[in-house]
């Protein structure tokens, strides 16, 4: 949404995989099941380049894969295009990937370690939608500043450019709970509620990651869903419910 992500995006690919799994679950379509397995393998290989997979036949962009594998990427890539890999951290894409069982335990631990310096930078345990922030000193700034329909919103630390979206934090918490981690969702929930009047939660569109001020529109249902997801991720039976939703296992 007005952010310069192009090519094969992590978010779109995991949504497609989820749709195929649900299609197979509903219609018992064996071809869809095989297609889903092929796509699952391609996502796991291509979006987390490693030296051990450098000759894997499923690689889509060999040069970009090799370059990113040598950089020791600690999380899933955001997108793959003819230019190479976009290695911004995409919270929404990671949330869906974790929910669908696309990351190993080792990779999950790497993702959490990657988030720790982000939490220190932000000053609290809240997860920006995309990271790192693009500033006017970065080469991506030119693409970002012209990429809007009516008014420019992606100032540093705002909107998708480092803004903290409750809905995506909720989804990420669900992904963490599927991996057996309820501590992170609990910590995120407490950090978020410190910024809110718990008797009258703002449910703003996003929170600026530099000032921790509520921004954008308020009283949004999808921001409220983030709170629902966070609470569900802490409950002990959330994992069984999610298995039914995602058809992961």
Q: Where in the sequence are the language-model features?
A:
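Catalytic cores of carbohydrate-active enzymes
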Residues: 5-9, 15-136, 194-224, 231
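Short glycine/proline-rich turn/loop motifs
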Residues: 1-2, 77-80, 148-157
